[in-house]
Amino acid sequence: MILIKNGRVIDPKSQRDENIDLIIKENKIYKIGKFDESDEYEKIIDASGNVVAPGLVDVHVHFRDPGFTYKEDIESGAKSAARGGFTTVICMANTNPIVDNEDTFNYVKEKSKNACINVLQAAAITKGFEGKELVDMEALKKAGVPGFTDDGLPLMDSNLIMEAMIKAKELDVPLSFHEEDPSLVGNPGVNAGKVASELGLKGASSVAEDVMVARDCMLALKTGAKVDIQHISSGVSVDMVRFAKYLGATVVAEASPHHFTLTEEDVLEFGTNAKMNPPLRSKWDRDKIIEGLNDGTIEIIATDHAPHSKEEKDREFIKAPSGIIGLETSLALGITNLVHKNHLSMMQLIEKMSINPAKLYNLNIGFIEEGAVADIVIFNPEEEWTVESFVSKADNSPFKGKSLYGKVNYTICNGEIVYNA
């Protein structure tokens, strides 16, 4: 048994926020209350000054297996997640081969059994990411797929998307969408505007996102499907999601830490380590994302953890791949830029990083109560630390060298300590 003493337990399900102890027995939260130390515990953790929260859940990561394991693999990705306080992640399907069939899905599922945290795998919406024919969603759901996404590529056939939504509604699974109309993207990875012009690039206009978000919100309203707008970056799109929710659509949006922290100006400082799709946008867009997080329009924070090798990111801007890593800095960026700046309460932040993403994928996790699975993160929200090295195979991050608040000290998954600072 493990006794966690003197911590500030924050649980978004019950709205509990109090100094109280937890006992973990086997893989469950056995008791919540006030307990004395004794020899019966194998481990006693003094969580004084720390928040004790549900293990974090990230619904948007790339662990690059199969096909690109020189960038990341399931083991290294899981360890990176554990260091960041995450106990469950959902991997995207843009691997090689693409996860669009049961064999590839089962390969990842089998490899994930040895991971230190819960690694779940989403499947593609269309075969081969070609946007022409739906995968066998029913068979894949039976195999254990929690949701479907062609993340990395936008889906352009509206009728096919409507078919997918009707099927997803029937199967009670979410569909997650990467929203960028390629015909409106001059150069990916940088916002169309002043910075793109300085770099001699056309950039990617926010309207490329807006038109796709508008379409998918309306299709979600029509079909009743549960739809996730991935890595929202445009302020106008935030307003559209808010309106779609008002109309009754089951639409959720996820924001990445880089989109609520940085702006297009940071591309000039960090170069390819600030290149991602969708790109960093204007200060106005960033402020609209923070507003959306604050008022509940954006329910989920997800990293879009996208590892690349140093050689790939060292190429010139236009040739370098898009994406940055995020698992090891996500919580601290939320604490530093949202909680400490009074945009969100600690309860709201934890909610957007645990129970809300779990609900999207119909997972019965993300909360602290007796009998629940013992997935726990223990972190000091006031401890300052400098981002220096990563557990991930990659280090493509614009936050290297930055001082952040919020240090993860323990991550416990299924009752086992999987990370200890």
Swiss-Prot record:
The lineage of its organism: Bacteria, Bacillati, Bacillota, Clostridia, Peptostreptococcales. The active site is at D304. Gene3D superfamilies: Metal-dependent hydrolases. Zn(2+) 1 binds at H60, H62, D151, D304. HAMAP family: PyrC_classI_B. One of its GO terms (molecular function) is zinc ion binding. GO terms for cellular component: cytoplasm. InterPro entries: Amidohydro-rel, DHOase, DHOase/Allantoinase_Hydrolase, Dihydroorotase_CS, Metal-dep_hydrolase_composite, Metal_Hydrolase. Transmembrane segments: none annotated. Its EC number is 3.5.2.3. Substrate binds at H62, F63, R64, N94, N277, H308. It catalyses: (S)-dihydroorotate + H2O = N-carbamoyl-L-aspartate + H(+). Zn(2+) 2 binds at D151, H178, H231. Belongs to the metallo-dependent hydrolases superfamily. DHOase family. Class I DHOase subfamily. Keywords: Hydrolase, Metal-binding, Pyrimidine biosynthesis, Zinc. Pathway: Pyrimidine metabolism; UMP biosynthesis via de novo pathway; (S)-dihydroorotate from bicarbonate: step 3/3. The keyword Zinc applies. Binds 2 Zn(2+) ions per subunit. This is Dihydroorotase.
